């Protein structure tokens, strides 16, 4: 009985110790938006990453679908009846992908812009900071231009977001 009591007490002690907060560890190697754009290398990689988002717009043929989708170039393709018949709506996968890709890239631009405007990044001189800010603003404007061309009045978030925004003022 004494052995059973010792085992029971030991098990309960271990169970109670597992809920202590001193066992929680901070992941120092995890990259987040909060710590990614705090160094010169991080902000440089962030700006370079903005250019890789343009690949989706041009290589994945979003602009071809948006500009030439209803023309006779796409007649032979199956699954493009909405384009051919001019009955494209928000349920179209190409339209949704274009919208999502553009706003995902706008959010990345906003994160870089906010970091450049609000953080004093060690090792980043004023000329490089100005260049990175100009590149980020231009790429964001590029996406807004294509969104406005395709959809008209659109929401234009100018701050990075982590969740769905249901109410954004139009500019």
What feature does the model see in each segment?
Residues 1-29:
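Bacterial Sec-dependent N-terminal signal peptides
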Residues 20-64:
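Membrane-proximal, proline-rich intrinsically disordered regions
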């Amino acid at each position: 009985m004494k052995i059973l009591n010792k085992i029971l007490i030991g098990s309960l002690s271990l169970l109670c110790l597992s809920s202590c907060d001193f066992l929680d560890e901070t992941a120092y190697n995890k990259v987040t938006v909060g710590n990614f754009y705090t160094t010169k290398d991080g902000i440089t990689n962030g700006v370079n990453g903005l250019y890789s988002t343009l690949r989706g717009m041009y290589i994945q043929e979003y602009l071809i679908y948006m500009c030439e989708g209803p023309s006779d170039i796409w007649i032979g393709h199956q699954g493009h009846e909405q384009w051919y018949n001019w009955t494209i709506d928000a349920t179209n996968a190409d339209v949704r992908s274009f919208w999502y890709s553009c706003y995902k890239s706008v959010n990345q631009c906003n994160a870089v812009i906010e970091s450049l405007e609000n953080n004093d990044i060690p090792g980043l001189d004023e000329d490089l900071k100005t260049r990175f800010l100009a590149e980020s603003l231009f790429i964001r404007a590029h996406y807004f231009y294509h969104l406005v061309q395709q959809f008209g009045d659109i929401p234009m978030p100018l701050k990075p977001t982590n969740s769905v925004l249901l109410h954004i003022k139009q500019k």
